[in-house]
């Protein structure tokens, strides 16, 4: 993932603490691919690109990545996060302007376990979007 400094990419525990080395490996592959794409594009400055901000809401401590470039979305977006408390039988809800984009049931959530939610990019096409919120919600 590209940092706020153009051309500097970070992954693994430098970015945020991971529970599984598998996720570090997956993230490092992505960071390497993005770094290669950056170099092959002639080190194009992306600071003026349109972005989607990710915002932690009710029960969520943080989300990675914090920004997604609209013109560089892959087939699937993976948001990594940790919850603030221990929860049972809840939903992770991703919203755009109050409208639910995705909802995933979880039996157990704990701050010590990194969570992730995968969102198909096709769900974001043809809608006005500049912010995705993620929150813990009561299961219905």
Predicted features, each with a name:
Residues 1-140:
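Residues forming the flavin
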């Amino acid at each position: 993932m590209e940092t706020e400094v153009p051309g500097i990419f970070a992954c693994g525990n430098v970015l945020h603490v991971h529970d599984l080395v598998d996720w570090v490996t997956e993230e490092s592959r992505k960071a390497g691919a993005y770094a290669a794409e950056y170099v092959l594009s002639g080190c194009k400055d992306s600071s003026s690109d349109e972005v989607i901000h990710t915002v932690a809401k009710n029960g969520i401590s943080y989300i990675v990545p914090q920004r997604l470039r609209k013109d560089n979305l892959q087939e699937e977006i993976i948001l990594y996060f940790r919850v603030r408390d221990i929860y049972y039988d809840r939903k992770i809800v991703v919203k755009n302007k109050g409208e639910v984009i995705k909802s995933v049931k979880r039996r157990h959530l704990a701050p010590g376990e990194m969570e992730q939610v995968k969102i198909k990019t096709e769900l974001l096409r043809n809608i006005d979007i500049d912010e995705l919120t993620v929150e813990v919600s009561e299961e219905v």
